[in-house]
Amino acid sequence: MKDDLFIALQRIIPHHAFSRLVGWFAATKIRWIKHLFITKFINAYNVNMAEALEPNPENYANFNDFFVRALKPDARPIASEANAIVSPADGAVSQLGEISGDKIFQAKNHWFSIKELLACDDELAEQFMGGSFATIYLSPSDYHRVHMPAAGLLTQMNYIPGDLFSVNPVTTENVAGLFARNERIAAIFDTEFGPMAVVMVGAMIVASIETVWDGQITPASREVKRNVYSKPREIKLGKGDEMGRFKLGSTAVLLFPKGAIKWKEDIKAETTLRMGEMIAELQTQA
């Protein structure tokens, strides 16, 4: 009953208007407001400020700056193995496994297609058919910068407008096609093992999604926007390099080509991850 009410409320709340309202409070520099928000958040989620590059909460300009705080250089070591695919974020695995044809498993009986998720053409979708996927949920208490699972050259980024349902486990199990329905950006990289997709999915009260190459991407428009990247503007990122950030929390979805990687045996649904740890092993070399 409680879960049904939670889902019902999400269906009637104006997602974007509510998120903009929360976004205003998160961006305000009014001292007492931002201090109240930050202090309450640290206490509610037991945030470890000792690992933050700036450990003093009072030194953040606003709640957003605190939320996407940088960590000390040694806080998240990047797996050094040459064949390591690493976690792009702190979070928990929602689902991972093989892509069934062009279908990606969400939860229970819910699936969505590669084309729906990426808003791409058949040619790109076919490159991920039968491949591997992982969905990583970033809770409010997690570090909210997203990093590269492997080194790559950015070739394309799609902005896809949509809803802003919560992406917590309750909603994931009850809203069909959730990750292909919410507002998101899909970044496609060329790697040594073929294409790799990193999708940053927006959610309720996520005021914006940012990338390191184009800054704030959302909220953008009501239309799909496709950007292609090539010379002279080449954007190359190494394994573990930051690629974007959420203001506030959400989900990252990873896609890999068929046969490119093998998930570590101890990585499964509900596994807690830290950015930079090895989650899969590269199976093919260019």
From Swiss-Prot:
Its cofactor is pyruvate. It is an enzyme of class 4 (lyase). Its EC number is 4.1.1.65. Pathway: Phospholipid metabolism; phosphatidylethanolamine biosynthesis; phosphatidylethanolamine from CDP-diacylglycerol: step 2/2. The keyword Cell membrane applies. The keyword Cell membrane applies. GO terms for cellular component: plasma membrane. One of its GO terms (biological process) is phosphatidylethanolamine biosynthetic process. The active site is at D90 (charge relay system), H147 (charge relay system), S250 (charge relay system), S250 (schiff-base intermediate with substrate). It catalyses: a 1,2-diacyl-sn-glycero-3-phospho-L-serine + H(+) = a 1,2-diacyl-sn-glycero-3-phosphoethanolamine + CO2. It is found in: Cell membrane. It is a peripheral membrane protein. The modification Pyruvic acid (Ser) is found at S250. One of its GO terms (molecular function) is phosphatidylserine decarboxylase activity. Binds 1 pyruvoyl group covalently per subunit. Keywords: Cell membrane, Decarboxylase, Lipid biosynthesis, Lipid metabolism, Lyase, Membrane, Phospholipid biosynthesis, Phospholipid metabolism, Pyruvate, Zymogen. The record marks G249, S250 as: Cleavage (non-hydrolytic). Is synthesized initially as an inactive proenzyme. Formation of the active enzyme involves a self-maturation process in which the active site pyruvoyl group is generated from an internal serine residue via an autocatalytic post-translational modification. Two non-identical subunits are generated from the proenzyme in this reaction, and the pyruvate is formed at the N-terminus of the alpha chain, which is derived from the carboxyl end of the proenzyme. HAMAP family: PS_decarb_PSD_B_type1 (MF_00662). Heterodimer of a large membrane-associated beta subunit and a small pyruvoyl-containing alpha subunit. Catalyzes the formation of phosphatidylethanolamine (PtdEtn) from phosphatidylserine (PtdSer). Belongs to the phosphatidylserine decarboxylase family. PSD-B subfamily. Prokaryotic type I sub-subfamily. This is Phosphatidylserine decarboxylase proenzyme.
